[in-house]
């Protein structure tokens, strides 16, 4: 009994405020043991799979099988002798991955963009999680035609789909020269920011379609409410707030080793390496130490929620933007040890305060039972049922629950669905909108979902739909795609925000 308790100690904490909540993630699709057990029986019934197979793909089964979104192997040694490993059919795993790769290969942008502001990615380039995944991906092409995917087949424990690269902001020194329009916008920003009392309403209006990289750090500080509009007060405010943050470090950080804080710190320590694992910047020990301090201090100062998995992602846009204030070159590969101690302290403190301001507006997303997220997912379902009934009915037909894919969209603010450069552009608008991270985000999620309506309607089984929704091909997205997404979200908000009965049946 004691052994069982110790095994589950880190996986499910007590239901108290501040306890770690499970996070549904695309990197960890559900595995139903019953589906695996019945796989051999079902293979003999090819072509006779019913659209609704009792409870096999129901939400309750999904929730039970995804009570922990993180792989067990991420926290502790995997037991390869366990029944789940013994019953996993490798051919099924290969067939599943191959089917998804085949279905979505047509969505990948193959022509190279000659004047792109993003990092160039060869047409045949695929980011693979590990060398073993690469081998499985190569071998799967031969099995996809021989082993068609059925709803009753189980998914692999780990996805074999290439991970979506989280490429950093457009910081490369080789970026194309600014156009006349861009120069005019930059000058307008500089005039606003240098005025004695910055007109915040005008600044929000100018920032909605995107903030120039050169003035983004100070603009974000102002829009988040971290800096005052009065230019004479800014220097003293920054100095005071930065000293206050490092006062918290001196006061609280050593308590991470105390018994009542060990759970929180350990979970943070586990999650930090998972934050943007494909960007070298975030794998540097010094950067990970900065993130650990930021998250631990925030958790200590917000006991109602404490640290929840997913909050770690929200630090990264602020960190990259404030780092770009000191770095001209490509940020994602920059070695932060080249910066002075004062620069690093400024970046850390500013990231902490701006993240705190963001979370102040959405803290009910992270309190016990995460009621804010549940409410937003329900609102998304109601909204989609009105704006695209065909997509909504398609989900119902194949028993796909919105919580199965939209939980992460709300928990991580679409950060796991988009490249980091797109997240930064998205946040320009979120910080310009009233309640951008809470209210406007709902309409962005609705627009994002409908963007893929054709691909959604092409999928005709439960597993295919989930694999699509949890691995949407946005690797080549840039400012143009985000601009169109935001325009559609604004249209939906204009139509429905002031008339909630429009999306109530």
From Swiss-Prot:
<feature type="compositionally biased region" description="Polar residues">
    <location>
        <begin position="129"/>
        <end position="146"/>
    </location>
</feature>
<protein>
    <recommendedName>
        <fullName>TBC1 domain family member 22B</fullName>
    </recommendedName>
</protein>
<feature type="domain" description="Rab-GAP TBC">
    <location>
        <begin position="210"/>
        <end position="434"/>
    </location>
</feature>
<dbReference type="InterPro" id="IPR035969">
    <property type="entry name" value="Rab-GAP_TBC_sf"/>
</dbReference>
<keyword id="KW-0007">Acetylation</keyword>
<dbReference type="GO" id="GO:0071889">
    <property type="term" value="F:14-3-3 protein binding"/>
</dbReference>
<comment type="function">
    <text>May act as a GTPase-activating protein for Rab family protein(s).</text>
</comment>
<comment type="subunit">
    <text>Interacts with ACBD3 and ARFGEF1. Interacts with YWHAB, YWHAE, YWHAG, YWHAH, YWHAQ and YWHAZ.</text>
</comment>
<keyword id="KW-0597">Phosphoprotein</keyword>
<dbReference type="InterPro" id="IPR000195">
    <property type="entry name" value="Rab-GAP-TBC_dom"/>
</dbReference>
<feature type="modified residue" description="Phosphoserine">
    <location>
        <position position="58"/>
    </location>
</feature>
<feature type="modified residue" description="Phosphoserine">
    <location>
        <position position="154"/>
    </location>
</feature>
<dbReference type="GO" id="GO:0005096">
    <property type="term" value="F:GTPase activator activity"/>
</dbReference>
<feature type="modified residue" description="Phosphoserine">
    <location>
        <position position="116"/>
    </location>
</feature>
<dbReference type="Pfam" id="PF00566">
    <property type="entry name" value="RabGAP-TBC"/>
</dbReference>
<feature type="region of interest" description="Disordered">
    <location>
        <begin position="105"/>
        <end position="146"/>
    </location>
</feature>
<keyword id="KW-0343">GTPase activation</keyword>
<feature type="modified residue" description="N-acetylalanine">
    <location>
        <position position="2"/>
    </location>
</feature>
């Amino acid at each position: 009994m004691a052994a069982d308790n110790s095994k589950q100690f880190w996986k499910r904490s007590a239901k108290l405020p501040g306890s770690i909540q499970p996070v549904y993630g695309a990197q960890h699709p559900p595995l139903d043991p019953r589906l695996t057990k019945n796989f051999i029986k079902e293979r003999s019934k090819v072509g006779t799979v019913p659209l609704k197979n009792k409870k096999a793909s129901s939400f309750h089964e999904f929730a039970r099988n995804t009570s922990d979104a993180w792989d067990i192997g991420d926290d502790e040694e995997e037991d390869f002798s366990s029944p789940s490993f013994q019953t996993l059919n490798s051919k099924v795993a290969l067939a599943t991955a191959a089917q998804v790769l085949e279905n979505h290969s047509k969505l990948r942008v193959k022509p190279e963009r000659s004047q792109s502001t993003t990092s160039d990615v060869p047409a045949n380039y695929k980011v693979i999680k590990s060398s073993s995944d690469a081998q499985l991906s190569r071998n799967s092409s031969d099995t996809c035609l021989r082993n068609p995917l059925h709803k009753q087949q189980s998914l692999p424990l780990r996805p074999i789909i290439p991970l979506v690269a989280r490429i950093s902001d457009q910081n490369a020194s080789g970026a194309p020269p600014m156009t006349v329009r861009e120069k005019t916008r930059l000058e307008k920003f500089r005039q606003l920011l240098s005025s004695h009392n910055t007109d915040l309403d005008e600044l929000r209006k100018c920032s909605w379609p995107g903030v120039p990289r050169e003035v983004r750090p100070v603009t974000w500080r102002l829009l988040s409410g971290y800096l005052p509009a009065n230019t004479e007060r800014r220097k003293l405010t920054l100095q005071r707030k930065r000293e206050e943050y490092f006062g918290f470090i001196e006061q609280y950080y050593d308590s991470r080793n105390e018994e009542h804080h060990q759970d929180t710190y350990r979970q943070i320590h586990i999650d930090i390496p998972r934050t943007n694992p494909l960007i070298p910047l975030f794998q540097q020990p010094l950067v990970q130490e900065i993130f650990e301090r930021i998250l631990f201090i925030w958790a200590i100062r917000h006991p109602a929620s404490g640290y929840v998995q997913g909050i770690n992602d929200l630090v990264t846009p602020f960190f990259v933007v404030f780092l770009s204030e000191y770095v001209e070159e490509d940020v994602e590969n920059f070695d932060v040890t080249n910066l002075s101690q004062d620069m690093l302290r400024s970046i850390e403190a500013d990231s902490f305060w701006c993240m705190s301001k963001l979370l102040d507006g959405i803290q009910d997303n992270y309190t016990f039972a995460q009621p804010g997220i549940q409410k937003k997912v329900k609102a998304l379902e109601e909204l989609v049922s009105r704006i695209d009934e065909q997509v909504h009915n398609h989900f119902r037909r194949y028993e796909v629950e919105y919580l199965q894919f939209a939980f992460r969209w709300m928990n991580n603010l679409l950060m796991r669905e988009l490249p980091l450069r797109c997240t930064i552009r998205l946040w320009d608008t979120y910080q310009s909108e009233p309640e951008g991270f809470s209210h406007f985000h709902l309409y962005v999620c609705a627009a994002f979902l409908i963007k893929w309506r054709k691909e959604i309607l092409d999928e005709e089984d439960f597993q295919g739909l989930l694999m699509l929704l949890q691995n949407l091909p946005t690797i080549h997205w840039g400012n143009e795609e985000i601009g169109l997404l935001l325009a559609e979200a604004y249209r939906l908000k204009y139509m429905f925000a002031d008339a909630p009965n429009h999306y109530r049946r």
